[in-house]
Structures are given as structure tokens and as C-alpha cells.
């Protein structure tokens, strides 16, 4: 296995769009798709953004010893679970790219080690992030504003300065100008790929 480039950031930081654009510019990176029990959103595709599964499938993977890390969020719509499974995606020699949370990054770092897991933390000023989140939610057929607010507040705790420091996150990519942010990330990944 090559390196795993792991994108993270608070909700509405632009990480999903950045992830897609980085994959376009670096097609040699293979993707890791994580799992979730939450409902699929408009515009998402099963197996692309996430594998959308139910609790029964999660239990099967747990019993098979395949779940690397698991997070549960008590949302206003019930408990949503997100997890990474060692389901064959990590068996390749390719460099990989994934998207997740700081919590999942810490667990994956324990599983794979510092040498293999490269953090890419995307930062956006909170006011701009809230504005983006609200615009995105308004476009949904059934906007979930309460959940948007819960996520926004939870992110403040989940991505606190102390937690970023404890996780060893020292570099931040500021997403003020998305094209510039993407260029910086692509350059950083290319440099790390050369030192494998």
C-alpha cells in the first residue's frame, strides 16, 4: 500500500468538492469509500461519496472483524453511523485518497501508522462556512436545518485547536479561494508521492 492522503475539515468547508477536484487532477490516486447508515442526500451516489448501508450490514462487517473505526452521531433524525472497513480497498499498492473526520483520522493513524497516513486539513472561517452550509441545505428537497446547526456546533468541539494539535495536524489548507486551495493540496500530495 502506498500513502493514504486523508482530507478532513468541518462541515461546509468544501472538502467534498475539493476531494473531487483533487481526484480529477491526480487520477492516479485511488479512492477509499467509507460507510454510513445515514440516508443518502440528493446528488449522492452509493459507492461514490459513501457506501450507504443499514445496521445489519454494519453488524456483519463488525462480526467479520472488518471495521477499523466507527463513529456514531446522535442527530435530530436518529443515530447516524459512519465507519471505515478493511474490505479490500487497502490491499492495493497504489496511493489512496479518502475523506473523513479528525476522529476517524486518529483511529486510522493508529491502524496504519504515521508513515502511511498523510493529513490534509481544510480550514474555512466559521461565518463563511455557516453561509455555505445554509445555501447547501436550502437546495435539499427537505432541508434539515436543525441537523445543520447541530453539525456546525459539534464541529467547533470536534476540530478544536487542542484536538488538532493532539492529532498531530500541523498544516492547514485555507479554502478562501477554492482553486488556489486545490492547487496547494495537489502540490503537497505530489511532493509526498515522490518520497514514497
Whereabouts are the PLM-identified features?
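Small-molecule kinase domains that catalyze NTP-dependent phosphoryl transfer to phosphate-bearing small molecules
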Residues: 139-189
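Hydrophobic anchor at the beta1->P-loop junction of P-loop NTPases
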Residues: 7
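Short beta-strand-centered segment that lines the nucleotide-binding/catalytic pocket of NTP-utilizing
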Residues: 28-41
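Pre-Walker A (Motif I) flank of P-loop NTPase domains
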Residues: 1-4, 93-94
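Walker A/P-loop
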Residues: 15-16
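P-loop (Walker A) phosphate-binding loop of NTP-binding proteins
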Residues: 10
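ATP-dependent small-molecule kinase phosphotransfer cores
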Residues: 38-96, 100-102
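Conserved phosphate-donor/acceptor-positioning beta-strand/loop module used by diverse small-molecule
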Residues: 96-101, 112-135
Amino acid at each position: 500500500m502506498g500513502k493514504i492522503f486523508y482530507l478532513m475539515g468541518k462541515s461546509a468547508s468544501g472538502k467534498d468538492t475539493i476531494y473531487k477536484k483533487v481526484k480529477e487532477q491526480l487520477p492516479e490516486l485511488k479512492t477509499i469509500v467509507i460507510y454510513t447508515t445515514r440516508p443518502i442526500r440528493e446528488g449522492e451516489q452509493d459507492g461514490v461519496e459513501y457506501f450507504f448501508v443499514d445496521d445489519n450490514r454494519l453488524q456483519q462487517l463488525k462480526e467479520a472483524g472488518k471495521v477499523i473505526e466507527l463513529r456514531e452521531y446522535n442527530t435530530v433524525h436518529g443515530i447516524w453511523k459512519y465507519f471505515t472497513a478493511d474490505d479490500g480497498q487497502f490491499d492495493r499498492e497504489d496511493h489512496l485518497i479518502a475523506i473523513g473526520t479528525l476522529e476517524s483520522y486518529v483511529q486510522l493513524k493508529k491502524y496504519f501508522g504515521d508513515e502511511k497516513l498523510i493529513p490534509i486539513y481544510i480550514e474555512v472561517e466559521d461565518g463563511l462556512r455557516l453561509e455555505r452550509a445554509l445555501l447547501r441545505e436550502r437546495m435539499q428537497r427537505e432541508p434539515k436545518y436543525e441537523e445543520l446547526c447541530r453539525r456546525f456546533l459539534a464541529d467547533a468541539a470536534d476540530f478544536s485547536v487542542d484536538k488538532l494539535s493532539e492529532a498531530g495536524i500541523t498544516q492547514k489548507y485555507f479554502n478562501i479561494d477554492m482553486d488556489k486551495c486545490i492547487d496547494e493540496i495537489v502540490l503537497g500530495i505530489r511532493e509526498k508521492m515522490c518520497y514514497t
